[in-house]
Amino acid sequence: MLRLSPPDREKLFQSPRLRVIFGGGEANVAVSLATFGHAARFITAVPKHEVGDAVVNELRRWGVETGCILRQGKRLGIYFAETGANQRASKVIYDRDHSSIAEAKPGDFDWDKALDGIDWFHT
């Protein structure tokens, strides 16, 4: 997923700037495992355009295996994250409808290849 968040503790629509980070729970787990020297393979679907390329390259940069990532669909899921301040709680707004992974079907994946040699499958 693509995370968009305002700098510091600004509110989402208070700031003219947004930081761009690729992440999401499952991606964060894969990156953490790879960082600690474990083999990690990421299984998902991302768009076949420059944004999808950037996601795959970011995962590879951290040592995550990306050979089972499908390149299909037209959009990457997005989430907007505001960091809370004082009495204001943090807030997350998800925009995942019609993303590549949301529209992927189980039969789109080569599960024999994806699960080959896998001891643990995290969802």
Indicate where each model-derived feature is located:
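Positively charged, low-complexity intrinsically disordered leader regions
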Residues: 1-11
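Short, flexible micro-motifs
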Residues: 2, 26-28, 55, 80
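A glycine- and small-aliphatic-rich helix-loop capping segment at beta-alpha/alpha-beta transitions
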Residues: 10-14, 110
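Short pre-catalytic strand/loop immediately N-terminal to key active-site residues, enriched for Gly-Thr
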Residues: 13-23
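Conserved donor sugar-nucleotide recognition element shared by glycan-biosynthetic enzymes
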Residues: 22-26, 51
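Alpha-helix C-terminal capping segments
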Residues: 30-39
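Conserved N-terminal subdomain of the carbohydrate kinase-like
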Residues: 39-123
